[in-house]
Amino acid sequence: MSGRLALVCHACALVLSASALRPLPAQSPADSIQAATLDKLKTVIASFEPARQIRWIRASGPFDLEGFYDNGLRWSSRLEIYITVTHQATIWLRVYPQYYGHHINVNRVHDPSGLMQQMLRFSYHNFFFWGLDDNLDAFAGYQFTLESGFPEESVKEVIKSIPLIDGSVGDLTPFILR
């Protein structure tokens, strides 16, 4: 009887351990494109001087880059930068200006309507578009498509332009302050 009990226990242990094992997912073609694009972005960041002025930190996602810029800003305490390489063969760049250490949230400003109108004007006239994320935090953004290959020179131009967002924050100040 004890031999059968041991056999049953071993069989149960084998079934339980086998059920906990999951096959590793195969890398999809989209993942390969994302990984190659991310490697190219990292190469630009490592070699392009304006990108090296941004302090890059460990990103939360496997195809994300995160950093912040705080050199010589007049209106923002710092600019938080998030770059995502998507499955749709695009690169998203989002820059969240911090005003006195906090994101500019439409629910916490003096004039939400005026802020949104000014952000729409910026989107029409400026290099970056402006928007709100799901938390209603304001950001300046840019989006690249990879249809014609990796846009290295365009990426450099956008990275070089990130500090200019600080001037737009100055234009938003009348709508932020209470």
Task: Report residues per predicted region.
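Charge-rich, low-complexity N-terminal segments
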Residues: L24-R78
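A mature extracytoplasmic/lumenal domain signature
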Residues: Y69, V85, V95-Y99, D134, ...
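N-terminal secretory signal peptides that target proteins for export/translocation
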Residues: M1-R4
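A short, solvent-exposed beta-edge/loop patch
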Residues: L120-G170
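Short, highly charged C-terminal tails/helix-capping segments
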Residues: P174-R178
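Short, internal acidic amphipathic alpha-helical interface segments
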Residues: S28-A30, F48, R94-A138
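Bacterial N-terminal signal peptides
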Residues: C9-S19
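A short acidic-to-branched-hydrophobic micro-motif
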Residues: W75-I104
